[in-house]
């Protein structure tokens, strides 16, 4: 059980936001020969002015080939991702103080890839994933402010595709 809460008091006014995310994530791991599988689910709640509850899959499988030289893997999961004023302000220091902060809901994250090691010093990971996201934020100009030098947030539903390639070389033992 994972819980986290935070409260934001912004500026001199009465703007305050309190939210909490509660997570319950039971799962089972199994291993048979070179196959490793995880099957479970994640129940999460996004509690702010009103509470919303989500049920996400949490499954992953990998299979070791050639003594861990190649490990194909795939999975499917979801998550409630916390957005904080500090995180948003680091991305854009010109953010208006009176923004409505919503957590991003990762409804589905399907991913697959191949990782492995060619030697004790050299590892790699190549993967792709497709995310379906609700409340994904974008920065837009704040046309209401007097000198229009601030940004507001707008939230949209998006589908995001990511391609990742990693190569690691570790010199030493």
Where is each model-derived feature located?
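Surface-exposed extracellular loop regions of Gram-negative outer-membrane beta-barrel proteins
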Residues: 2-6, 15-46, 173
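Alpha-helical repeat-solenoid motif detector
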Residues: 8-10
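Exposed, low-structure sequence patches enriched in small/polar residues
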Residues: 36-38, 44-47, 52-173
């Amino acid at each position: 059980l994972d819980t986290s809460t935070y409260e934001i008091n912004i500026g001199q006014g009465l703007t305050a936001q309190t939210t909490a995310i509660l997570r319950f994530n039971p799962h089972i791991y199994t291993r048979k020969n070179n196959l490793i599988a995880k099957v479970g689910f994640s129940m999460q709640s996004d509690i702010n002015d009103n509470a919303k509850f989500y049920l996400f899959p949490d499954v992953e499988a990998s299979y070791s080939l050639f003594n861990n030289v190649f490990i194909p893997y795939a999975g499917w999961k979801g998550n409630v991702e916390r957005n904080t004023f500090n995180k948003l302000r680091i991305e854009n220091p010109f953010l208006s103080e009176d923004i409505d902060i919503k957590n991003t809901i990762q409804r589905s994250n399907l991913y697959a890839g191949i990782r492995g090691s060619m030697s004790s010093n050299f590892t790699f990971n190549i993967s792709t994933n497709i995310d379906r996201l609700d409340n994904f934020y974008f920065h837009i100009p704040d046309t209401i402010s007097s000198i229009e030098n601030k940004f507001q947030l707008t939230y949209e539903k998006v589908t995001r595709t990511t391609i990742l390639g990693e190569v690691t070389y570790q010199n030493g033992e």
